[in-house]
A protein has these predicted regions:
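Conserved hydrophobic positions within beta-strands
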Residues: 40-42
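OB-fold/S1-family single-stranded nucleic acid-binding modules
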Residues: 102-125
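Short boundary/loop segments of OB/S1/cold-shock single-stranded nucleic-acid-binding domains
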Residues: 22-36
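Bacterial N-terminal signal peptides that target proteins for export
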Residues: 1-11
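Short aromatic-glycine-enriched beta-strand elements
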Residues: 48-59
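Short nucleic-acid-contacting surface segments enriched for D/E, G, S/T with interspersed K/R
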Residues: 81-97
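Short, structured beta-strand/loop micro-motifs enriched in basic residues and often containing a Trp
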Residues: 72-81
Length: 126
């Protein structure tokens, strides 16, 4: 009986520890069914783990500017392993990016893909 209780305690503790990690990696805050493409000038880029981040400034038809925040994407090391040179998305470069919008912020997106001016595409998630 003591062994069963010990195992139940161990399994319960492991599940409790794993739950926050699962919540952290949930995409529920994004509408992943959408793929919205933007073209703009890179304003900021953070090549970091666990998630890279990118800000684009997109010119609108009326001459105004819109800031698009890709607040979460793949880990930087994954993007580099795919062949992306960080210099290709440096501040000041013009690129295209595809994102899934956050449900609570119209200017925040999950970064699904980066498309360089030569057409080369780096898909983070389908």
């Amino acid at each position: 009986m003591k062994t069963k209780t010990l195992w139940q305690t161990i399994v319960g503790a492991l599940v409790a520890v794993a739950l926050p990690a699962g919540a952290h990696h949930s995409f529920a805050i994004y509408d992943m069914s959408q793929n919205i493409e933007f073209e703009g000038v890179v304003e900021t880029v953070k090549m970091r783990n666990p998630h890279m981040a990118l800000t684009l400034v997109e010119s609108q038809a009326d001459g105004s500017k819109r800031t698009i925040n890709f607040v979460e994407g793949a880990p930087a090391n994954m993007i580099v392993r795919m062949g992306l040179n960080p210099a290709d998305i440096a501040v000041g470069k013009t690129i295209k990016a595809i994102g899934a919008p956050r449900r609570d912020d119209p200017n925040a997106f999950f970064l699904k893909a980066i498309i360089l001016p030569d057409g080369k595409r780096y898909s983070v998630i389908n």
